[in-house]
Amino acid sequence: ENDYAEFFMSYRIREQLSPDLTFATDIIMNSDLEDVSYLYKYGEYISKNEIDTAIYLSTFTEEEIESMARTYTEGYRLGFEAAKIDLSAKKTVNIRYFLGQERMVKAAIEQFRAMGLEPICYRYAVSRINRRLISRVGYSSTVPNKQLEYDHRMDEALFLDKKLMERKLEVLRQAYRNLAHEASVYAGPAVIEVFGENPFEPVSCDANPVLDKKQQEIQVEYRTESAQIVNEYIEQDKCSFTIIAYPIPEIGDRYREIFRA
């Protein structure tokens, strides 16, 4: 009998806190970003959005890319300055981005490193034991089938109970205990969002798994207690964040115009 919580959750926390897991960083820093075939190294779904984004960014001059990245990284640094938080005490930054944006992300990594921050780039959670609804926190690409993702947003209803919740909290606590130093030097997320996706109206189906009342209570209890564990190791008043957003090609024919607006 094994719920695999220890493996999947422990590894997920390591992904979020350790700069030693460099799968995505290596793709960004070591690939020829002029050749869009680098996108397929991720093993993710690659659509016209990702390809056209990468192609468009390849037309920018180095100065333009540096300027884009500087707006992003300086926004991050100034957030610490405004909050009077000592950024020099931090060693890592989590970069969240949309595939196709690697040319800008590469410049941002170099700028963050000049601030003394190593990048942490991880994929959005795919295991239901780590994922919340349809949230995609981390690097991601276009969702190939939004209805399918919506249909399975509460698959944990098939197995969630009090025992599993307690097990997850136990594993979470131990994972943070093992990575206490990494948590203490984590500066916070630097997020690159996208906008302009085609509207999607999900269709509900009675066959879809949904949490019952008891499971909803368990979920609320888990979120409350897990947040307390995270806050014990990552002091929120010593972290900051930044968010910037760019359009994606499916926004329409004026994509390039909107991008530069």
Residue locations for each model-derived region?
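Active-site bordering "gate/hinge" segments
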Residues: 1-261
